């Protein structure tokens, strides 16, 4: 269900020729048909969320095609022109290097980088936001970047919730409870849901849910009897907060609305939204 202000609406893309119109329409249809409530203050916030999700998906595919390597933190490496490898295996932005340039380099020169899956997901999030922000704004928000697992910049606002419906652009986690300790890096896989039943995970590539589970099961202890599985944990960029920094020159998605109800009372507690 999609709520704009106090109105429950069924949105649709009015310009079928705009970039990624079909993908955006699919996302809108999924959100409108889900039981989960997606609440926005304005139509511009919804437009930002749509563009953000599309850019998360395209950034995931760009990273997949960049040559970016899968490595444990002990074996991680980065381009020393822009980053310093920390003692824990993270990537620390060098002084006087604009974070926008350094993030873009990961996608241009992926073979010069290697790390594990959680860091890759945060890199994708940064790249998606860079596509929607002015470089000056991005560099101000994310100065002194450190890329290391979930130790992301405090100005990157994320929402993690348990339960809810899956939407393209969501980050979800596959867990492998009986992983072989010799390959502990395969205890799970962070992935971006691309839509159409496909996921991107750094290390497994673009695969279906069943294929990712199969890949993780191959890395269990001998005689394991518990299968890997897709958890119900969903992580998203908080598009309502991050939309404040959007570039005014970013094209807005043309969205029309079929009104369903205009007297909804919306209450949000934590990450759970209820409509009365």
UniProtKB/Swiss-Prot annotation:
Enzyme Commission code: 2.3.2.13
Keyword Acyltransferase carried by entry: yes
Keywords: Acyltransferase, Sporulation, Transferase
GO terms, biological process: sporulation resulting in formation of a cellular spore
Uppermost EC category: transferase
Catalytic reaction equation(s): L-glutaminyl-[protein] + L-lysyl-[protein] = [protein]-L-lysyl-N(6)-5-L-glutamyl-[protein] + NH4(+)
GO molecular function: protein-glutamine gamma-glutamyltransferase activity
Pfam families xref list: TGL
Classification via NCBIfam families: PRK03187.1 (NF002869)
Protein purpose: Probably plays a role in the assembly of the spore coat proteins by catalyzing epsilon-(gamma-glutamyl)lysine cross-links.
Family per record: Belongs to the bacillus TGase family.
Listed name of the protein: Protein-glutamine gamma-glutamyltransferase
